[in-house]
């Protein structure tokens, strides 16, 4: 009651926003006579003037009125299109970082030019996001004359562009492209090996066309770049045959090729073992005569040897794994249960498969992934436009913090939306649809029949064929052809069947597309021929208006009211006449699940017979209530999933920030020194635990690990024998000094610049490998975390806790691996230092799979996330986003 009273007194939030913006419209209109008086050169010079004023301290908001007036005048001169006042309001809504709901035919493509131009003045770039490549190319070409007149550059991105072409496109002031392409380019940039390989600039301002489709419908499925792991089956098999020839060292001081550490579940080659395996590898022609296994070019070979040794020495059949159906299945050491689908990482699983003689699987690995909600939230400012957003306004506000502003139409809407007709059976419903289509055909009224699935559209097509009714079928497979058919769907007597999502972005013009007719004329067509085409189009246009405009028939209600409204919105553009009606049956999915009992009992009470429909506003209201419930359910699901996504996203931000910092470094000495100190401290703490008695120490094992893994000769037992009062901190100091001395010898051989390049390559390669394995671990954690609910634990909190633990472990392992490789690999020349980078680049050339499973036509709304970057770049003294409470530099920022 109170909210209704306040609305009556002050107007709704939407009305207040529109009233505020109407004042700005008056200011823009006041500039119009001045703009009309300017020459083309003077008008084009406005851009430079605005840039200078912006650089001198004027804000974009202060420039808005004059800039919008400039664009309107240029649009009229170049395209013959003048922005309506309501389009100016739409442009202001987008500039403020909100969503403009504008009906079909209200010129959203033209509206985008206003905020795009204004925000391009800052020089930081604008991305306009479309749902398919056809629309990106069409819209960029269509609006290009406006931007080029004003001295701005326009780029368009699409798949299969060369790297150089894409870099050039992104340098443009205004870039058009699809949501998929922007997302994949972001992921590829964060897999690049140097800053010069990146294509994207700052993610500054995005204008998302069909924002509901991208931020809600498509948000559920992530963008994934996956790559087939390199097929090393033959190498695993060859090395597997060599390992049984190695002999285990039983006691300290005995002969043997390798030792085992059961506590750490590790196996290490001894000095004799190194020589022996090098000899065996040389005989097998896997190593050149006289070459060391620890040469920089043999890092991958060393990795395979370590995996094979571990598989033979530490992993035993029917204890650690079983062989079932010709596959190696892991056994959980805690529960004794098998874990189908789980695989050991770092090549260990393949090494065990080679040992057991079963087929070696090279699975696809996820190299990088991101959801649209997490990608678009990184923009400094995000806005969107669509014909149908108001029904999802709560979700946009709650999850993206985006306001939806409903923009009034330029002309009054006169479309007639008729009440739903409900039948007992689907057969009755389809028969009624056929009759409606036939009646429209008699009066030559164009019809668009919307279906919820491709299957339904093809079934209806078969029924129309039986009745000899000529029609076109659209099911969103070929965008360019689709746009052409949709454009012609307004011709007299045209019948078009389309899935609900088909043809978004293209208007159905009554009488057909005049632009298409003119384009079909020969290039040298005379004015008379053009005039004849225009007259013919006008005749068709008038005929369709006389017949009642476009008729919309819905063959079933969708789970979302928004999709139903999209279908209805095809008719009644720019004040055109039109009508719409939905035909339903009690056998439809939505009716069967939610409304069938109530409606069926109502039909029985009214004595309805098969073939007879029920038409009542109560029925329509009951159906819409069912849709609201379902929308609420989907929103809750998306919100839940979003909470999980945010955990992974925080980790991604940390990794990508560190990665970019490392790529930008010319000298990595400080980073490596910090890592080395942490790794050595951690090693000492493992074998000589803090606050422990000397009896609990294992100095020999510590010496062995330092020797085997890091090639550091540290006689820790001797130090303790000589001085029983020695403290762990002193041992750490001595080990670190030896590690530095050992590494400094390598630096002296080839020089600091060469070593820095090698260090950077090793850090990036190791980071990428560990991040890839971490993504798989996070996925496995996510799949089973809901079971914690049965133990009265909050799955979300458990997921955060375990994800943090996994992330910390991953970074610890990463540092250990980097220092191990840098300590053990031999670098003799500058060429050796470039080997890793060359291997890495070769890996990147391998074809990567780009995956984004778009929702099928009958899939429902989806995941979502927030709007305008509320998190600035992570500062060294800011709290770490992982949630530990520590400063970033003391937590996950310690890598950089």
Curated annotation (Swiss-Prot):
It is an enzyme of class 7 (translocase). ATP binds at residues 87, 105-109, 507. One of its GO terms (molecular function) is metal ion binding. The keyword Cytoplasm applies. CDD domains: DEXDc_SecA (cd17928), SF2_C_secA (cd18803). Pfam families: P-loop_SecA (PF21090), SEC-C (PF02810), SecA_DEAD (PF07517), SecA_PP_bind (PF01043), SecA_SW (PF07516). GO terms for biological process: intracellular protein transmembrane transport; protein import; protein targeting; protein transport by the Sec complex. It is a peripheral membrane protein. Zn(2+) binds at residues 880, 882, 891-892. Its EC number is 7.4.2.8. Residues 866-876 have a biased composition (Basic and acidic residues). The keyword Ribonucleoprotein does not apply. Keywords: ATP-binding, Cell inner membrane, Cell membrane, Cytoplasm, Membrane, Metal-binding, Nucleotide-binding, Protein transport, Translocase, Translocation, Transport, Zinc. PANTHER family: CHLOROPLAST PROTEIN-TRANSPORTING ATPASE (PTHR30612:SF0), SECA INNER MEMBRANE COMPONENT OF SEC PROTEIN SECRETION SYSTEM (PTHR30612). Monomer and homodimer. Part of the essential Sec protein translocation apparatus which comprises SecA, SecYEG and auxiliary proteins SecDF-YajC and YidC. This is Protein translocase subunit SecA. It comes from Legionella pneumophila subsp. pneumophila (strain Philadelphia 1 / ATCC 33152 / DSM 7513).
